[in-house]
Regions:
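Expand to "…catalyze enediolate/carbanion chemistry for C-C bond making/breaking, isomerization
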Residues: 1-275
Length: 275
C-alpha cells in the first residue's frame, strides 16, 4: 500500500471543484464539511458530498472531514455518508478520547486538535477503527497560546510516536496557510520530514507539486540507499550475517529496510530518475 503524500481539501459547498481536486494529482481528496463551510450551508455541503461519492471516478482516494461528532451535525454526516461505497474514510475533527470512535461505520482518521487529544493520542491511535491520526495545529496552538515552533515540534513528536506505536502510517503535516509562499511551504515540509512527519494536507492545487518534491528523497539519499541495498544483497549472496559498506561501516536490518523504503518512495515520486 502506498502511503499518501499529498492531501487536498476542497470545500463541501463548492461541488464544481470536486472533479478538479480529483484531477489535481493529489493522492487524497478531502471534501470538507467542517471549517470550510458556514453553518447555513452545511446541509447543502453534505448533500453535495453524497452526490459526488455516488458517482466518483479517478484514482485519488476520497475522504470527508465531517463535523464534530459531539454535535448533531457530525452524527448526521456519518448517517448520510457512512454507507456510501465511494467514501474511503472520514476525518474526525476534535477527537479527544477513544470512546467516540466506537461503532463507526467507516474507517477514520482522527484529528487531534486540543490538549486533551494530545494527551490521549496513544489510546486514540490504538483504537481498531482508526487508520491514521493527524494534527489540527492551528486550533491546538490557539488553545495553548503557542507561538514557538520548537514547542509545536514537541507536540508533533508525541503524535508521531503514538502513530508509530500503534502501527499506523506516518503522520501528515497540517496545512500551510500561505498559498503564495511556495519557498516557505517547501522549507516547512523539509523541517517536518526531519522529525518523522510524512506528507501534507494542502488548501490549493498549486501546493501539491511543492509538497511532493519536498517529501521526495534527494539524490544524495537515493545514492546512499542504493549503496546500502547493494551491500545487503552482496552480503546475502555471500551468506554473511553482517552488512558492511564500502567505507567500512556496518549497518543492521532496520537501516537496510529504511533504505529499501527510500528507493521505493523515490521510484514512486520521481520515476524519471529510475528509467
Amino acid at each position: 500500500m502506498n502511503i499518501p503524500v499529498t492531501w487536498l481539501y476542497v470545500p463541501g459547498d463548492r461541488p464544481e471543484r470536486f472533479d478538479k481536486a480529483a484531477a489535481s494529482g493529489a493522492d487524497v481528496v478531502i471534501i470538507d464539511l467542517e471549517d470550510a463551510v458556514v453553518p447555513a450551508r452545511k446541509d447543502e455541503a453534505r448533500a453535495n458530498a453524497a452526490a459526488y461519492l455516488a458517482r466518483r471516478t479517478g484514482s485519488a482516494e476520497v475522504h470527508v472531514r465531517i463535523n464534530d461528532l459531539a454535535s448533531g451535525r457530525g452524527r448526521d454526516d456519518l448517517a448520510a455518508l457512512g454507507g456510501l461505497a465511494g467514501l474511503d474514510a472520514v476525518r474526525l475533527p476534535k477527537v479527544e478520547s477513544a470512546g467516540v470512535l466506537d461503532g463507526l461505520p467507516v474507517k477514520a482518521y482522527a484529528l487531534l486538535e486540543s490538549a486533551a487529544g494530545i494527551v490521549a493520542a496513544h489510546t486514540i491511535a490504538a483504537h481498531p477503527g482508526v487508520v491514521g491520526v493527524a494534527l489540527g495545529e492551528q486550533d491546538l496552538a490557539a488553545e495553548l497560546s503557542i507561538t514557538d515552533e520548537s514547542a509545536m515540534n514537541h507536540l508533533r513528536l508525541q503524535v508521531v510516536l503514538a502513530a508509530a506505536a500503534a502501527g499506523l502510517p506516518p503522520v501528515p503535516m497540517s496545512v500551510y496557510p500561505d498559498v503564495q509562499d511556495e519557498a516557505g511551504l517547501a522549507a516547512s515540509c523539509r523541517a517536518g520530514r526531519a522529525i518523522g512527519l510524512f506528507g501534507r494536507t494542502a488548501i490549493h492545487p498549486r501546493q501539491i507539486p511543492v509538497i511532493r518534491r519536498a517529501f521526495s528523497p534527494t539524490r544524495e539519499e537515493t545514492d546512499r540507499a542504493t549503496e546500502i541495498v547493494q551491500a545487503a544483497e552482496e552480503a546475502e549472496r555471500a551468506g554473511a550475517g553482517a552488512v558492511a559498506l564500502p567505507d567500512g561501516r556496518f549497518v543492521d536490518a532496520p537501516i537496510v529496510a529504511r533504505a529499501r523504503r527510500t528507493l521505493a518512495l523515490a521510484e514512486r515520486l520521481a520515476p524519471e530518475d529510475f528509467s
